[in-house]
Amino acid sequence: MKTLLLLRHAKSSWDEPSLRDFDRPLAPRGKRDAPRIGKALSERGPLPDLAISSPAARTRATIKAVMASARLEAELQVEESVYGASSAELMKLIRRLPGEKACVMIVGHNPGLEDLVARLTGETERMPTAALACVEFQIDRWKDIEDGEGKLVWLLTPKQLGHESEKE
């Protein structure tokens, strides 16, 4: 069995209009939500063996906060292709994952992540900022992953964790 954790970056800031999209930092709400999602992941599991992040500032800040609060010791890779990736591009990445990794987290962006959840599970789910989806596959090798064969085990959002994330 293989498990894929799909994490959308936490809420980013638009306060500095001169910044490129790639360089936008987390907003105060994002800085609160990312550790809360990490804590929930550590309580719920499964924990990833490998985390792959888009190189954008907001995704790197999100995964660092999630890993710290979850006390994850997973290998972290920054992958250029995740930034702005479509579901098809993410599928190519997933099919190349190392076979020994049973649980992998990808930290990225919409619409790619929402589209990927729908593609893998057949379920249309909204992925707001800092949402984390857990999808399981009855396969032994990542290269065997196919559309519609994943089971959405859970989808966690900051809103489900309470109203603290809505204060800004």
Identify what each model region corresponds to.
Residues A40, A65, S69, R96, ...:
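Active-site catalytic microenvironments for nucleophilic, acid-base chemistry
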Residues K101-R119:
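A glycine-rich beta-strand to alpha-helix segment
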Residues K2-T3, L7-S81, A85, E89, ...:
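Active-site-proximal alpha-helix that buttresses catalytic centers in soluble enzyme cores
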Residues E123-V153, P158:
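Domain-level recognition of soluble alpha/beta enzyme cores
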Residues R44-P46, L97-A102:
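Glycine-rich phosphate-binding loop signature in dinucleotide/nucleotide-binding domains
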Residues S18, V117-T121, E146:
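Short, flexible helix/strand-to-coil boundary loops that buttress conserved ligand/catalytic motifs
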